[in-house]
A protein has these predicted regions:
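Boundary at the C-terminal end of the N-terminal hydrophobic targeting segment
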Residues: 17-19
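Sec-dependent N-terminal signal peptides
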Residues: 6-8
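Positively charged n-region of N-terminal signal peptides that target proteins for export
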Residues: 1-4
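Extracellular polysaccharide-degrading/modifying enzymes targeting complex plant/algal/animal polysaccharides
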Residues: 23-206, 213-214, 237
């Protein structure tokens, strides 16, 4: 009996000890390193370069992935799923953004633009159902078709119709002469089959579908202080049987909704700023939304 109790104690201590910090630096990191320190110390010690590698290094039990803000956007999709990315009520798995930008855009500078009519050009992007167009770092002004035809576009305006991006440059210029981008990656952060997760202090933009998508079976998960804007469909999407809290977050300029729910999900929405100028602040295609602020997670 004494050995059994001792074994349980050792197991408890081991499960606590395995939780660790993994650092990511997309400028100075290297995926051959351990990720255990924020700066390089020799060939093996130092931050990794990608969030994908950091997730592969996770072992469950409440690891923390800490992004170093290098000033350069992180250009990757993040998939948080399964036991290795789950924590406990006392020690959640964390993705700490430190104000970093997760960017899903691709340049249109060398895209195969074709002349449509007048001063309007068009191009067919990889993802055609939802899109955004950016002039440099700023979303371009979008127009919508009301009759199935390309609307009248003023210079530097665009629309999405029948799988094409239509864009009108300024007189005497071609689309290739602009610093144009569109959505080139599907979803910024996908959560699936995880529990006890905290995602904080990130900017997510330029993804074809959603900035953050809690797809299914996501439990006891908090999204805190995340700005998810200018994505093709929505800033935040909660679906399936997920239970998620979104707290002090922001969303603007998304294509179909700032926040959307579906399935049998329950979303707790605490504070935040969800600008309805481009699309409704909340679209419910199923699920339930509560706005109370309970003491527990």
């Amino acid at each position: 009996m004494r050995k059994f109790i001792l074994g349980l104690l050792l197991l408890s201590l081991t499960s606590t000890a395995v939780a660790r910090d993994i650092y990511v630096d997309n400028r100075n990191g290297d995926d051959r390193r351990s990720g255990r320190t924020p700066t390089a110390d020799g060939e093996a010690s130092g931050p990794v370069r990608t969030i994908e590698k950091a997730i592969r290094l996770c072992g469950g039990g409440g690891d923390r992935i800490i992004l170093i803000n290098s000033g350069e956007p992180y250009r990757e999709q993040v998939s948080i799923q399964g036991p290795r990315c789950s924590g406990t009520a006392e020690q959640p798995f964390e993705l700490i953004g430190n104000g970093c930008v997760l960017d899903g855009r691709v340049p249109l500078e060398e895209a195969p633009w074709e002349h449509y009519r007048g001063e309007i050009f068009r191009v067919q992007p990889k993802y055609m159902s939802f899109q955004q167009v950016f002039l440099g770092e700023t979303p371009a002004v979008r127009r919508y078709s009301t009759d199935g035809l390309v609307p009248e576009l003023k210079p530097l305006e665009w629309c999405l119709l029948d799988g094409y991006i239509y864009f009108r440059p300024e007189p005497g210029r071609l689309p290739e002469s602009y610093d144009l981008y569109c959505c080139g990656a599907k979803t910024g952060i996908t959560l699936y089959n995880v529990h006890d997760v905290v995602i904080s202090d990130l900017v997510v933009r330029g993804f074809h579908l959603d900035g953050v998508n809690a797809h299914d079976n996501v439990r006891r998960t908090d999204i805190i202080g995340v700005n998810s804007s200018a994505n093709g469909r929505s800033g935040f999407s909660v679906g399936g049987a997920s239970r998620v809290r979104i707290e002090d977050c922001a969303a603007a300029g998304n294509g179909a909704a700032q926040v959307r729910t579906e399935g049998f999900s329950i979303l707790q929405l605490n504070g935040g700023n969800f600008d309805p100028a481009s699309a409704p602040a909340l679209v419910q295609e199923g699920g339930r939304v509560v706005t109370r602020n309970p003491a527990g997670r």
